[in-house]
């Protein structure tokens, strides 16, 4: 098993591409002891399963009922909020003394079917004061009412606005938001919209069957069936491919990716990082030993969670330094 910060390669991270199925019953990597109580609590919450599209609205309602109030996040990180139209909230440190060093546009998780602009905004919000970030968090349209094409278009519109004044912009996303960020990053490349970088935290890149998808088929944080149904809803009528299935990755800005060794998306993320390197893209990959999907948002004070936060902080700091050099 890989340790903090190692990129994965070799026989313990085998990716099954295309429509091939995983037929073996691979051994399931262990969740770190310090994270098990949080995972057990997720299981006790009994979020509705997503067996098919008819379960999506029930899942979305349950997700909304469990969501943290926006005021809680703003108070935790001492953030000031200003609305920028109907779909964007701009978060800045309340005592920001000067213009932000870096603008971060954030896309929330929720499987492309649930969530709000504040869900997971700690990803960048926790660093807003220290690193002088301006965080734009987006309420993008959700499936099945909107498809993946519409989501990408909505994000691209915001990114055109965010980059219009020449400010350095990092596009960041967590889980489903990370996958959407990867797709929107490709759209920016094609449209000539310049981004400073992409920060993809445990991104939901595709619905392929991989070893890790089989290992965590029934995971309490996000399982294989839910992933397949969510992607089916998002891709209905959409011309866009999931970013994990795209072959044309050259020309992207620097990319940060991370994943847990004990999560469903692990192998898709590791494979994506390898293909970024093959395409000549500057990519940084971390595989967090014993972490499950989004565990750093559940048990923030765990050693492995603190390591994940520190790695993201370091990468954002590097982006800020590059922007002013």
Residues of each region from the PLM?
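A glycine/proline-hinged amphipathic helix-loop "lid/cap" segment
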Residues: 1-96, 324-325
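Alpha/beta-hydrolase superfamily serine-hydrolase fold, recognizing
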Residues: 27, 31, 35, 42-49, ...
């Amino acid at each position: 098993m890989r340790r903090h910060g190692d990129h994965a390669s070799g026989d313990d991270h085998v990716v099954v591409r295309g429509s091939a199925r995983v037929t073996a019953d691979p051994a399931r990597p262990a969740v770190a002891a310090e994270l098990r109580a949080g995972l057990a609590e997720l299981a006790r919450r009994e979020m509705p399963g997503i067996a098919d599209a008819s379960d999506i609205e029930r899942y979305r309602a349950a997700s909304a009922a469990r969501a943290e109030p926006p005021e809680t996040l703003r108070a935790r990180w001492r953030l000031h909020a200003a609305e920028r139209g109907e779909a964007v909230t701009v978060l800045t440190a309340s005592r920001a003394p000067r213009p932000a060093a870096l603008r971060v546009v954030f896309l929330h998780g929720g499987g492309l079917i649930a969530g709000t602009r504040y869900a997971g905004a700690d990803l960048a919000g926790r660093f807003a004061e220290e690193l002088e970030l301006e965080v734009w968090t987006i309420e993008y349209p959700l499936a099945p009412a909107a498809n993946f094409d519409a989501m990408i278009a909505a994000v691209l519109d915001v990114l055109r606005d965010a980059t219009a004044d020449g400010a350095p912009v990092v596009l960041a996303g967590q889980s489903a938001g990370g996958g959407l960020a990867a797709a929107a990053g490709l759209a920016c490349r094609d449209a000539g919209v310049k981004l400073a970088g992409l920060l993809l935290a445990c991104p939901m890149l595709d619905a392929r069957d991989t070893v890790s998808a089989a290992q965590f088929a029934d995971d309490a944080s996000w399982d294989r069936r839910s992933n397949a149904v969510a992607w089916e809803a998002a891709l209905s009528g959409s011309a866009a491919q999931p970013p994990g299935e795209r072959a044309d990755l050259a020309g992207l800005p620097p990319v940060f990716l991370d994943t847990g060794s004990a999560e469903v998306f692990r192998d898709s993320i590791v494979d994506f990082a390898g293909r970024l390197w093959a395409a000549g893209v500057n990519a940084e990959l971390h595989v967090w030993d014993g972490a499950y999907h989004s565990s750093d948002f559940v048990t923030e004070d765990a050693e492995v969670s603190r390591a994940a936060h520190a790695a993201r902080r370091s990468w954002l700091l590097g982006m800020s330094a590059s922007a002013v050099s």
